[in-house]
Swiss-Prot record:
Protein name, per record: RxLR effector protein PITG_12737
Originating species: Phytophthora infestans (strain T30-4)
Major subcellular site: secreted
Motif (RxLR-dEER): 42-58
Signal peptide: 1-16
Phylogenetic classification of the source organism: Eukaryota, Sar, Stramenopiles, Oomycota, Peronosporales
Function: Effector that enhances P.infestans colonization of Nicotiana benthamiana leaves.
GO CC field: extracellular region; host cell cytoplasm; host cell nucleus
Disulfide bonds, paired cysteine numbers: none
Length: 154
């Protein structure tokens, strides 16, 4: 939930800054132009663009792309977790299990999303374990060569 709040806050900040910049757009003047009186007391000058690139600029672009990729991975993981938790009461229904399977979420991730911290067969099956077991059988039927990375799974 914090991620969504931060994302909404960032969008609101950017949109506020953009609308403020648009209000001062009439104060832009080229370098060789005549003097313009502004009511805001600010005057922005537009300079000719050059082909020069600065190393700091290129470094920041790489960092932004890296951050973008990591953010997409985290958001996809959170979205998949929310999707599995939302549909977990319906995994017994084969159609819902197939819809989760279309997202290529393997049973190890489903196990993690259902907040099963460890696989303990001595306690007995709780509802989340039953859901995970049903999904595991469905996954193995469609992916016979798949091997689980969990230690105690057959």
């Amino acid at each position: 939930m914090r991620v969504y709040f931060i994302l909404i806050l960032a969008v609101a900040t950017v949109s506020g800054a953009t609308s403020e910049m648009l209000s001062f757009q009439n104060a832009i003047q080229s370098s060789g132009g005549a003097k313009i009186e502004t009511s805001a007391g600010r005057l922005l000058r537009a300079e000719l663009t050059t082909d020069e690139t600065y190393p700091e600029e290129r470094t920041s672009l790489a960092a932004v792309e890296k951050l973008n990729a990591k953010t997409k991975d985290v958001l996809k993981d959170k979205w998949d977790a929310a999707n599995v938790k939302y549909q977990s009461p319906f995994i017994y229904n084969d159609g819902i299990g197939q819809s989760i399977m279309k997202r290529n979420i393997d049973p190890d991730k489903v196990f993690k999303y259902l907040t099963q911290q460890k696989l303990d067969r001595t306690i007995g099956e709780n509802p989340q374990y039953g859901l995970w077991k049903a999904y595991l059988e469905l996954w193995k039927k469609n992916h016979p060569r798949w091997k689980s990375k969990l230690q105690t799974v057959d």
